[in-house]
Amino acid sequence: MAALALSEAMVNDRRKAFEALKAELSAKASLPSLPIEGTIATAIPELDRLLAGGFPSGSVATLEGATGRWSIAAGLVSAMTRRSLVAILDDGALYPPGLADAGACLERVLIVPVRKALEVARAADIILRSRICRLILMPAIALRDSIWARLATLAHRNGVLLIVMATRAGAALSAVAELRLHCALERIIMRGTHGLWGGFAGFQLRVNLRKHKHILPGRQARVRALSSLSAMSS
């Protein structure tokens, strides 16, 4: 009987300790994030606040979702071309005028046409090793775990931000990605009168944080992507 009572007491003590630890972690999760060293700002205030400064340099990150991921990428490319070269491995999804509308300096954008998975992997490997660009964008493709791991190692070693554009990241990519963001269309923004006489002004995105090395997932930000015509008329 004494042994049974002692065992129950130990279980109760462990349960109390667990509840106390859970409460402490929950309290820490509600605190504002501190700025993280070695980040690359996106020039989108709402997104930079979500990421405590921006994308982590020297890492693999994903921009996911059916809508809006290229709007986020365009803002980042615009900010980066002010001080560095940017490489984009293009499988046909890129629309260069959209980059220009976002303010990117196209003379500092290296566009590499790619079609096959092997071409994408080789191009990413070569540019990462060359260290000529601080930012590389590439399409999501099916690669072996070892290849994703090698690309992640090269990005980390050379201080390059490698962003993978994906509708949804697969298991191998998710494993090596230090940051994962998912973009979703929240609403269309109209200019002027609604209906026949209204005009498209842009859209509002909801950006969800799915993975981050230093920040708990689940946080989100709302970002407005305005068309160039709307910006000119405002």
Residue ranges and their predicted role:
Residues 1-88, 101, 210-215, 227-234:
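Detector for small/aliphatic-rich hydrophobic stretches
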Residues 16, 42, 68-75, 94, ...:
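Charged, alpha-helix-enriched surfaces in structured cytosolic catalytic cores
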Residues 47, 63, 109, 136, ...:
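Conserved RecA-like P-loop NTPase ATPase core
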Residues 53-55, 79-80, 103-104, 126-130, ...:
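Conserved catalytic network of the ASCE P-loop NTPase/AAA+ motor domain
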Residues 83, 105-107, 132-133, 158-161, ...:
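Short glycine-/polar-rich loops that comprise or flank the Walker A/P-loop
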Residues 83-146:
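Conserved inter-motif catalytic segment of the P-loop NTP-binding fold
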Residues 132-172:
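A contiguous pocket-lining binding segment that forms or flanks enzyme active sites
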Residues 164-234:
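Phosphate-binding/switch region of NTP-binding enzymes
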